[in-house]
Amino acid sequence: MIDQTAIIHDTAVVHESAVIGKGVEIGPFSVIGAEVEIGDNTWVSSHVVIKGPTKIGRGNKIFQHTSIGEDCQDKKYAGERTFLEIGDNNVFRENCTVHRGTIQDQSLTRIGSGNLFMVNVHVAHDCIIGDNCIFANNATLAGHVVIGDFVIFGGLSAIHQFGRVGSHAFVGGCAALNKDVPPYVMAAGNYAKPFGVNSEGLRRRGYTPEAISAVKRAYKEIFRSGKTIEEVLPVLTEMAQAEPAIQLYVDFLKDNERGIIRA
């Protein structure tokens, strides 16, 4: 179904089963496949390929030569029915690639809202990405990666499959992540190491000076006390009773399986 207000170039190919919302624009030579749903006021440039099953929300911008919803690159994939979901108001610049999930996980790749994917960013199968993140040019996410909210990835950075990055973390350019990065942490290097708290990012997002100070104290407990994760969790849990921002650390570390980056 194509809404009558949608603007579709004569050279674009749209499958009869696709659902195209109000005010959608689809540029020349783009291909919209079967079982694709594009939300209202989304703009699709020229030479874009979107395959289903894929659901895209409202107000997204998808630039030329981007591939959305393609089969994954996992060698175990054998044509199973898997999915991709994208929220609202995301920007995918030129040459981005986003793959659907696999049955070995939840059969789903999911991207939240308000994210910016710069040129050549790759999001592999089964990735889960939160809201308001920025991925600079050539950032690469392997399969099954989980990214929180307000995370920034520098250009040419990469993360190992099944890796996790907590909310408000900052990953420097050319970083290679082979372990998890807890919330609020700045990570850089190959392999990446922690370099303090993303204080500037927290200030921009309205964190109080008191909250930022508490986050820094928690950071020292995690990375400078010499304690294991099991030993530091009770300390952080107690700190979180006085400062709710610390709860992000607690929740993240409780779910840790791969280990976290270390100095």
Swiss-Prot record:
Family stated for the protein in its record: Belongs to the transferase hexapeptide repeat family. LpxA subfamily.
Oligomeric form and interacting partners: Homotrimer.
Intracellular or extracellular location(s): Cytoplasm
Name of a matching Pfam family: Hexapep
Pathway: Glycolipid biosynthesis; lipid IV(A) biosynthesis; lipid IV(A) from (3R)-3-hydroxytetradecanoyl-[acyl-carrier-protein] and UDP-N-acetyl-alpha-D-glucosamine: step 1/6
GO MF annotation: an example: acyl-[acyl-carrier-protein]-UDP-N-acetylglucosamine O-acyltransferase activity
Organism the protein comes from: Aeromonas hydrophila subsp. hydrophila (strain ATCC 7966 / DSM 30187 / BCRC 13018 / CCUG 14551 / JCM 1027 / KCTC 2358 / NCIMB 9240 / NCTC 8049)
InterPro entries xref list: Acetyltransf_C (IPR029098), Acetyltransf_C_sf (IPR037157), Hexapep (IPR001451), Lipid_A_LpxA (IPR010137), Trimer_LpxA-like_sf (IPR011004)
EC numbers for this chain: 2.3.1.129
Role played: Involved in the biosynthesis of lipid A, a phosphorylated glycolipid that anchors the lipopolysaccharide to the outer membrane of the cell.
Keywords (A to Z) from UniProt: Acyltransferase, Cytoplasm, Lipid A biosynthesis, Lipid biosynthesis, Lipid metabolism, Repeat, Transferase
Biological processes annotated in GO: lipid A biosynthetic process
Gene3D superfamilies (alphabetical): Hexapeptide repeat proteins, Udp N-acetylglucosamine O-acyltransferase, C-terminal domain
Uppermost EC category: transferase
Stated name of the protein: Acyl-[acyl-carrier-protein]--UDP-N-acetylglucosamine O-acyltransferase
Top-rank taxon, per record: Bacteria
One cellular component term from this protein's GO annotations in UniProt: cytoplasm
Origin organism lineage: Bacteria, Pseudomonadati, Pseudomonadota, Gammaproteobacteria, Aeromonadales
Keyword Cytoplasm: yes
Reactions the enzyme catalyzes: a (3R)-hydroxyacyl-[ACP] + UDP-N-acetyl-alpha-D-glucosamine = a UDP-3-O-[(3R)-3-hydroxyacyl]-N-acetyl-alpha-D-glucosamine + holo-[ACP]
